[in-house]
Amino acid sequence: MKKIIGYHINKSGIYTSKGESCLESPFLDFLLQPEPDTIKVFYHMEYSISNLLILIGVTREEAEKLQHKNYLHLDAYTLKYIPGKYFSIAKGHYYKCPFVNFSDVNQYSSAKLENVTSKEACLAAALNAQETGEEVYKTLTGLGLNPTSLTSPIKVYEKEVLDKIDLPTIDDIPEDAGFYAYQTCQGNWVETFQIGHWETAYDYDINSAYPSELAKLVDIRLGKWKESKQWIPEAKYGYCKGIVTITEPYSPITYNVKGSGFNNLNYTPVGEWETFLTKEQIEFIYKWKLGKFELINGWWWIPEKESKLLEDEVTKLYLQKEQSKGLSKKIIKRTASGIWGKFLQVQKDGFGDKFNPVYGAEVETAVKLRVSDFVLRNRINPISIAVDGVISPKVVNDLGNENEIGRWKLTDTASCISVGTATVAMKGKEKNADFSLSYKWLMEEIKRDPKATEYSMKKMSPVTLAVALNGNWEKLGELREITKTVYIGNNVKRQYKKTPEYGEDLLNNYYKSEPWDITVISNPVEEPDH
């Protein structure tokens, strides 16, 4: 059992959850003090490191190296820094030299920095970091893990669980099949279909959507791959290049637009375009009569035997999540979803060691199709879709056992205000993330100024190393006010015949959308080099 020590640093010095402080040099030696069986955490890493660099007199040139190369040699010391994730100090260049590393608990519970200036407030921040770290540590050990840092839940889970499972990777997939599969990965689906205000709306989501699909994945080494321009119905997985034609106004088939103008966004247009789709996506198009697909070429995986490699571990995580609450539940959920992320992980030096575009594609597209099936089957005109959830203006009955993994559940019934894509809020459902839209805040702003065309949220944010090096070096470590603006009637992902002009219009009208025609937003598909 390890103990947790919290740290907070400002321009006056270093403060710890043990009630200690260091207000003069040598600051690095203070941080290096040996603490056996201890995990050290920052209340807000980027803020603390910015101020530590000021305390130890780092020059701009040295800071540039730390930011861009992630390490810096200072006399006998070596600093390593990945912003918001990891920081370490080593003293000396020999085996078992003094060494310490830190994690950032701000990723688990958003830190408030506005009033953390006095000694008492700094010590309280350090204690808060310790308490958050203890909850994270308790959650991970409850999963049977033995973390030595709190940098990433999925990292320790990967080391102690995933690495012990013999999983197929990109090396087990024909190169072109892997390329086809990767092209079907378009990212999470977030889209708003209606704008306005509803006195009653219903928030549905899939219970552990990504884990439920992870549990279904089978070992692709127990079968054979076949390239064919013909449809192969017995294939379990298929990745097809072809011409899709979408004729219906609601469809889960996305088109990614890169660059300016329409921005880098996923759209769900109507029309005809060349693309890559999974076998399941094509079957979905025909099941719901959304259009058609003209097959040019495909890669197909035909099973000889089916073995579900992740089912047991995913089920364990799910049961643990259902028995948890608060931060612990969020950490377990994040860990389970992080498994999918490993299958699509791309690093600076190439693919991650578990990179598997087949698994990544199957999970991602399956969730989109589950959401679309729910919408179409229940004849919902959705207000919005956010990855694995649907906000609906109508109630859906007969959901079955909502507590089972992969089943639909009603998570909230409340008033809802929708401004545009990713700008939707349910009353009473406040989120901790920075600049998350609050129903209460927006309603108050509209009532205060009903004729406004935009509303701005403000918060204090640290001048981090990256920000300071971008023309604000003298302000390193200070707090600055940043703003996020909610614009009324400025939604480009779908087209509206009429849009709200002022805030008050949102409260008095409903605005329905239609998909763009592909000819308005299209750009060419890039072919691989062979």
Predicted regions and their residues:
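Conserved acidic
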Residues: 16-530
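Two-metal-ion RNase H-like nuclease active-site motif
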Residues: 1-10, 201-204
